[in-house]
Amino acid sequence: MDVRQQDVERIVVEVLKKMMSDQPTAAATTVVAASGCDCGDFGLFDRLEDAVQAAEAAQKKISTVAMRDKIIAAIRKAGLENAKAFAEIAHNETGMGRVSDKIAKNILVCERTPGTECLSPMAISGDMGLTLIENAPWGVIASVTPSTNPTATVINNAISMIAGGNSVIFAPHPNAKRASQTAIQVLNKAIIEATGVANLLVAVKEPTIEVAQELFSHPRIKLLVVTGGEAVVAQARKVATMRLIAAGAGNPPVVVDETANIARAARSIYDGASFDNNIICADEKEIIAVDSIADQLKAEMKAIGAVEISLEQADAVARVVLRNYPQVEGGKAPNPNPKWVGRDAALIAKAAGIDVPDSCRLLIVDVKRDINHVFARVEQLMPVIPLLRAANVDEAIEWALILERGLSHTAGMHSRNIDNMDKMARAMNTSLFVKNGPHLAALGAGGEGWTTMTISTPTGEGVTCARSFVRLRRCCVVDNFRIV
């Protein structure tokens, strides 16, 4: 067992010991679990069937909004209390990101994920009577979670899906299973203490391909939610037999035109592109600056702490962090080496033979007008960002469209020209479009609106919340129940 794995086990043991040492409240004296099955280890089961059965039984116990509100309050409290421990487990298990930023993500989803308050029924009255449209649960939702946000996604999905009256069976990424499973156990403990309802959140102890395939076609699961990259989304689309909500990859460009507040743009891009080592899919992945202000933008970013590397050094970095690079004729396209996804900028630089301060959070490379540069074309999920120089804002927007690859995920612009911002927003047609701020602002971190870790672009739900995880049911009363 390596040092990192030892750290994971140590922190998990500490969290679980604290869980077990806390005395349950009176509400937990009667635990509602599935009868006739393995009741699990605070939501963890050996067999998929037992997990599904337990989740089905739990879901039937949360029909009232008052109960859901109580459960969500318990989840928020437990998530905040364990934000640091969850972050440490995730970082030590995956090696990705930064503990401080993962703490911030965990806090954000606890505080800014909406609950039942975002669900409202609709009534339609007219000469022929009254029709009521209400939000009904799906039942048991299957949620596939990523290694990039293994605890924040569990917390966020748990709040949103329970708000809609559902229970959840999670399928954590195998490389982050301890982090996700620990979060599931801690949240279940909090729910039990608050309400006595067990197994609203469940998972199979050993996630395997076989378990995932069985989950994707399980007859008693009617909704599958996949938060992850292109590969897992593509696989889910091929085999899923139920409705699918999919959050896929992006390659978000940010354009800076000549009217922008350059200092503000530099700070926003630096903060966004370096946050958690750029593993959030909405983070800025390439900068397209109008040439007349490109040097000033670089200078401002370097003054904050970004380190500029040369094209030759960027080539050395690419050889370290990308597979199939340089690409041979007829060979596979370059793609990120998982070993380096989400690693610190200083570690990446030193592996490529480049001396940078240990405090370095972001590497920047000026690729001039090379829109085919590998760092512009490939989404690395690393704190390495290319800067391209466009002749004018129209060319910058044109390049942004090319580099975003039609994924319709996220894009941004720094400008004080309303026409330019309007033009780019319309052209990009992305689920998230950010003006004059870091891209994370669109997820409630420094901007208005709610937070999610499941940005569903491929299937169209966008920034998900409880409304995304309900079925609309209609009840029609003919000729009666109108008061006018």
From Swiss-Prot:
Superkingdom as given in the UniProt entry: Bacteria
Top-level EC class as recorded in UniProt: oxidoreductase
Induction and repression of expression: Highly up-regulated in the presence of taurine or isethionate.
A biological process from GO: alkanesulfonate catabolic process
The keyword Oxidoreductase is annotated on this UniProt entry: yes
Molecular-function annotations in GO: acetaldehyde dehydrogenase (acetylating) activity
Keyword entries, A-Z: NAD, Oxidoreductase
Oxidoreductase is among the record's keywords: yes
Transmembrane segments annotated in the record for this chain: none
Family annotation (Gene3D superfamilies): Aldehyde Dehydrogenase, Chain A, domain 1, Aldehyde Dehydrogenase, Chain A, domain 2
UniProt pathway annotation: Organosulfur degradation; alkanesulfonate degradation
InterPro entries tied to this protein: Acetald_propionald_DH-rel, Ald_DH/histidinol_DH, Ald_DH_C, Ald_DH_N, Aldehyde_DH_dom
A Pfam family: Aldedh
EC number in record: 1.2.1.10
Catalytic reactions on record: acetaldehyde + NAD(+) + CoA = acetyl-CoA + NADH + H(+)
PANTHER family (UniProt xref): ALDEHYDE DEHYDROGENASE-RELATED (PTHR11699)
Family assignment from sequence similarity: Belongs to the aldehyde dehydrogenase family.
Function statement: Involved in an anaerobic respiration pathway that converts the sulfonate taurine (2-aminoethanesulfonate) to ammonia, acetate and sulfide. Catalyzes the oxidation of acetaldehyde to acetyl-CoA in the presence of CoASH and NAD(+). Highly prefers NAD(+) over NADP(+).
Additional detail: Taurine is an abundant dietary and host-derived molecule whose metabolism to hydrogen sulfide (H2S) by members of the human gut microbiota has many prominent connections to host health and disease. The human gut bacterium and opportunistic pathogen Bilophila wadsworthia produces H2S when respiring sulfite (HSO3-) released from organosulfonate substrates such as taurine and isethionate.
Name of the molecule in the record: Acetaldehyde dehydrogenase (acetylating)
Organism for this UniProt entry: Bilophila wadsworthia (strain 3_1_6)
Organism phylogeny: Bacteria, Pseudomonadati, Thermodesulfobacteriota, Desulfovibrionia, Desulfovibrionales
